[in-house]
Swiss-Prot record:
This is Indole-3-glycerol phosphate synthase. Belongs to the TrpC family. Keywords: Amino-acid biosynthesis, Aromatic amino acid biosynthesis, Decarboxylase, Lyase, Tryptophan biosynthesis. GO terms for molecular function: indole-3-glycerol-phosphate synthase activity; phosphoribosylanthranilate isomerase activity. It comes from Methanothermobacter thermautotrophicus (strain ATCC 29096 / DSM 1053 / JCM 10044 / NBRC 100330 / Delta H) (Methanobacterium thermoautotrophicum). The keyword Nucleotidyltransferase does not apply. Pathway: Amino-acid biosynthesis; L-tryptophan biosynthesis; L-tryptophan from chorismate: step 4/5. GO terms for biological process: L-tryptophan biosynthetic process. Its EC number is 4.1.1.48. It catalyses: 1-(2-carboxyphenylamino)-1-deoxy-D-ribulose 5-phosphate + H(+) = (1S,2R)-1-C-(indol-3-yl)glycerol 3-phosphate + CO2 + H2O.
């Protein structure tokens, strides 16, 4: 599935560049305000929530018919940042959703399978504060991170293995995501965060992605050392999204038994 998605994304970028040349995106960005800081929102010392608007997924099919406005009203009160899934073919998302979410003043993560710097420009021109760069999918991670920073964004660099994390660190990532979902099988294992969290120096921001069904899962991941949790399917499919997120916020705010991660010096002493 992942190979099919990447192939589709490469074709998509070619078509997008024909319709909207990069020069137009650059011109649009020059007259835009600076985006709301993503690192400040998700790295403030408490366990933060990145709540996602996601209509569908390859593993679950259609997830929710709820509109963007309905969910953003909930997220505005309870989320520290918002992730907008923009892929249309597999997740039923769009850039219009990202642009629409800018009205609420939250830092926005454009979540897609980026394979070219063009999409970084597109994200910024649509109001994003951050983009998802997947280790092993984006072709030049260091260049992608630098391009984001040139455009006043800080990317979330997604990892699945210890090697991914070392590559992300070498590329200069400051926000590292551990995806608990296997992108090939779609199986979820929260223990992936448990195993990989010690590899992320304490000075950086660690985001645990996928698998939070309720407050118990959130408390477990907070205990593993996550600085932020990316939550999408649970609130989108919940009968009462606000009540669910209130329970999750309460659970992580009361989590006192958080595993300490290594500082930079300790990290290099441990793993050099």
């Amino acid at each position: 599935m992942l190979r099919d998605i990447i192939r589709s994304k490469k074709l998509e970028v070619k078509e997008l560049m024909k319709k909207t040349p990069l020069s137009i995106l650059r011109d649009d960005i020059t007259v835009m305000d600076e985006p709301v800081s993503f690192p400040a929102a998700v790295g403030g010392g408490k366990v933060s929530l990145i709540c996602e608007y996601k209509r569908a997924s390859p593993s679950m099919g259609r997830i929710s018919e709820r509109g963007l406005e309905e969910m953003m009203e909930v997220y505005q009160d309870l989320a520290d940042a918002v992730s907008i899934v923009t892929d249309g073919k597999y997740f039923k998302g769009s850039l219009d959703l990202l642009s629409g979410a800018t009205d609420y003043g939250k830092p926005l993560l454009m979540k897609d399978f980026l394979v070219d710097e063009y999409k970084i420009y597109q994200a910024r021109a649509s109001g994003a504060s951050s983009v998802l760069l997947i280790t092993g999918v984006f072709p030049d991670l260091e260049a992608g991170i630098q391009k984001c920073r040139e455009l006043s964004m800080e990317p979330l660099v997604e990892c699945h293995t210890s090697l991914d994390i070392f590559r992300a660190l070498e590329a200069g990532a400051e926000i590292i995501g551990v995806n608990n979902r296997d992108l090939e099988t779609f199986e979820v294992d929260l223990e992936r965060t448990h195993a990989l969290a010690p590899l992320v120096p304490d000075e950086l921001i660690l985001v645990s992605e996928s698998g939070v069904r309720g407050p118990e899962d959130a408390e477990i991941l907070a205990g593993y050392g996550a600085d932020a949790l990316l939550i999408g399917t649970a609130p989108m499919s919940a009968q009462n999204p606000r009540e669910l997120l209130e329970e999750i916020v309460d659970a992580v705010s009361q989590c006192r038994d958080r595993r300490r991660r290594y500082t930079g010096d300790e990290f290099f002493e441990q793993f050099a």
